[in-house]
């Protein structure tokens, strides 16, 4: 298949720049790929789509304030670092701007020296490995000095950084939010649980690769970025029991889908406690092994995320749904509206 097969017209004004005042006030497009039906709804009605005995699976990763602005100690030139992943100890892989001035041994100071980054290795595409030195606890220093790494298509300043976290965010490590989860409130989750739906959490730390465009025409040549995931034994046992009793596995977002399908592919459709790195690329032709339904936001044209949704619901039907969303003025991307796919 070709990347252009997943293109669609999207007016720029439909890209949501700020979150709605109420998380669950967003619109919800419910699409049923078997019956080829579409229903316009609101997100708090997702309760109607969930049945007693189902499991709702959410990614509890927490976004780090991973964008740091500092200056080189020798020249005082401005430097921007974006933390991508913790490689070991105080060493991090980062994306640096301007990268060409940051050679091995270069020191960058943040917050009047409260945090120092020393470049230990040069990588391609502006990547660097740096080692941080600081007093106290690294995450506390980062919380005070760092900024939220909002996606490149969001140009408005985020007034409340909690709005780029899910209400159940717990495990530090993401460079971007698992945005399908931003719509849930604690009250809505309580109602879902009261209905007899199991709430299950896994972790996948979202990397910046989630925003990288597909740069090849032939999808078979595209290589996905790797992201760290983890599923506990308790969560795996709960999900297997739900499956065995006839309930559905309903994933919140593409990160939850990719984690579940990675593990299901390893263990013949069964779920087991597991952790590691995944670069699974779910595109049309993929046979789903675990996920029965899911919620997700509206994604970028020609993105791997549109391809994932198309793998589940069919490309033509998904593009039809996207065109409907454009006509009905749904809001797109991270702070936008949602889709429930069954």
From Swiss-Prot:
Function of the protein: Transfers and isomerizes the ribose moiety from AdoMet to the 7-aminomethyl group of 7-deazaguanine (preQ1-tRNA) to give epoxyqueuosine (oQ-tRNA).
The keyword Transferase appears for this protein: yes
Subunit comment: Monomer.
Reactions it catalyzes: 7-aminomethyl-7-carbaguanosine(34) in tRNA + S-adenosyl-L-methionine = epoxyqueuosine(34) in tRNA + adenine + L-methionine + 2 H(+)
InterPro entries listed in its UniProt record: QueA (IPR003699), QueA_dom1 (IPR042118), QueA_dom2 (IPR042119), QueA_sf (IPR036100)
Key words, A-Z: Cytoplasm, Queuosine biosynthesis, S-adenosyl-L-methionine, Transferase
Top-level taxonomy: Bacteria, Bacillati, Bacillota, Bacilli, Lactobacillales
Pfam family, one: Queuosine_synth
PANTHER family assigned to the protein according to its UniProt record, in alphabetical order: S-ADENOSYLMETHIONINE:TRNA RIBOSYLTRANSFERASE-ISOMERASE
Gene3D superfamilies for this protein: QueA-like
Organism: Streptococcus agalactiae serotype V (strain ATCC BAA-611 / 2603 V/R)
Major localization class: cytoplasm
Cellular compartment(s): Cytoplasm
Top-level taxon of the source organism: Bacteria
Any single biological process term in GO: tRNA wobble guanine modification
Protein name per Swiss-Prot or TrEMBL: S-adenosylmethionine:tRNA ribosyltransferase-isomerase
Presence of the UniProt keyword RNA-binding in the record: no
Pathway per the UniProt entry: tRNA modification; tRNA-queuosine biosynthesis
Family label: Belongs to the QueA family.
Enzyme Commission code(s) on record: 2.4.99.17
Gene Ontology cellular component terms for the protein in this record: cytoplasm
Alphabetized GO MF terms: S-adenosylmethionine:tRNA ribosyltransferase-isomerase activity
């Amino acid at each position: 298949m070709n990347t252009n097969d997943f293109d669609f017209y999207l007016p720029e004004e439909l890209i949501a720049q700020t979150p709605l005042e109420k998380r669950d006030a967003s619109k919800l497009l419910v699409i049923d790929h078997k019956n080829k039906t579409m229903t316009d709804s609101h997100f708090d009605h997702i309760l109607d789509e969930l049945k007693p005995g189902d499991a709702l699976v959410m990614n509890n990763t927490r976004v780090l304030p991973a964008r740091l602005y500092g200056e080189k100690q020798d020249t005082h030139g401005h430097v921007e670092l974006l933390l991508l992943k913790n490689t070991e100890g105080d060493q991090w892989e980062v994306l640096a701007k301007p990268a060409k001035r940051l050679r091995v041994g270069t020191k960058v100071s943040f917050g009047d020296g409260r945090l120092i980054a020393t470049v230990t290795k040069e990588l391609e595409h502006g990547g660097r490995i740096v080692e941080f030195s600081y007093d106290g606890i690294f995450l506390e220093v980062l919380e005070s000095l760092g900024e939220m790494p909002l996606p490149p298509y969001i140009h408005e300043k985020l007034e409340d950084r909690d709005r780029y976290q899910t209400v159940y965010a717990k495990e530090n490590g993401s460079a971007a939010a698992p945005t399908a989860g931003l719509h849930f409130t604690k009250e809505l989750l309580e109602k879902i649980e009261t209905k007899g739906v199991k709430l299950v959490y896994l972790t996948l730390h979202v990397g910046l690769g989630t925003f990288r465009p597909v740069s090849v025409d032939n999808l078979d040549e595209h290589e996905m970025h790797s992201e760290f995931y983890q599923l506990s034994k308790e969560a795996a046992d709960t999900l297997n029991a739900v499956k065995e009793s006839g309930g559905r596995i309903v994933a919140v977002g593409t990160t939850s889908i990719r984690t579940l399908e990675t593990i299901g592919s390893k263990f013949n459709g069964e779920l087991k406690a597991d952790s590691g790195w995944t670069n699974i690329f779910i595109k049309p032709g993929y046979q789903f092994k675990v996920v029965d339904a899911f919620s997700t936001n509206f994604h970028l044209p020609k993105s791997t995320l549109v391809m994932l949704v198309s793998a589940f619901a069919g490309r033509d039907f998904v593009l039809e749904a996207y065109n409907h969303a454009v006509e009905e003025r749904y809001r797109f991307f991270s702070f936008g509206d949602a889709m429930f796919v069954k």
